[in-house]
């Protein structure tokens, strides 16, 4: 039994870590899974292990169908093109896993606010928060054409506890609020929007 057979899913940030794991499980459940990332075979970001092509191979090894689309979600035209590709090839989108977080390039330094570079804001809010926001902006019109749909944002949240890094805390809580706001705005469209915190992962 494949509970997601016939469903179309998009997982952003699918090269490694949570994005890869989610994409693989969606594939196992029968969904056709599009995944985006900057790391492709032969050109991995920062030479880190894992690419979207590797994720496709893992999905296919489990009997699923995966489609890799190279995308830098800080570039709106690339993000828009991903959604256009899904519309053209599938005619719909049922599930959006908004997992992109380009701030891995910067890392999370455990320093007081006044010792941190303002680059933390630029990176975490551009490659993290805005990247997820832009993906929603382009994907929601397609999701709204369904009778029902699902958006999941991956983030880091621990019952209002401070994460220990000023900019990281701001960015991750912004994503939680993004999910909350969208859940209210999209309720009439029967689109569920959730923020999921799998815990801190350095991937």
PLM region descriptions:
Residues 16, 38-39, 95-108, 156-157:
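Flexible cofactor-recognition loop at the NAD(P)H-binding site
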């Amino acid at each position: 039994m494949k509970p997601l057979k016939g469903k179309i899913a998009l997982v952003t940030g699918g090269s490694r870590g949570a994005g890869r794991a989610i994409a693989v499980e969606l594939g196992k459940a029968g969904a056709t899974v599009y995944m985006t990332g900057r790391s492709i075979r032969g050109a991995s970001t920062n030479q880190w292990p894992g690419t979207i092509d590797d994720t496709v191979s893992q999905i296919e090894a489990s009997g699923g169908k995966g489609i890799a689309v190279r995308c830098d979600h800080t570039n709106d035209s690339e993000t828009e093109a991903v959604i256009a590709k899904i519309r053209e090839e599938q005619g719909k989108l049922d599930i959006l896993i908004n997992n992109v977080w380009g701030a891995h390039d910067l890392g999370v330094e455990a320093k007081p606010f006044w010792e941190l570079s303002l680059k933390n804001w630029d990176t975490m809010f551009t490659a993290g928060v805005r990247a997820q926001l832009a993906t929603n902006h382009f994907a929601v019109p397609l999701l709204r054409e369904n009778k029902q749909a699902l958006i999941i944002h991956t983030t880091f949240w621990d019952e209002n506890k401070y994460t220990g890094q000023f900019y990281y805390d701001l960015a991750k809580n912004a994503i939680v609020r993004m999910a909350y706001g969208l859940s209210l705005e999209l309720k009439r469209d029967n689109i569920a929007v959730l923020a999921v915190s799998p815990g801190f992962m350095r991937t």
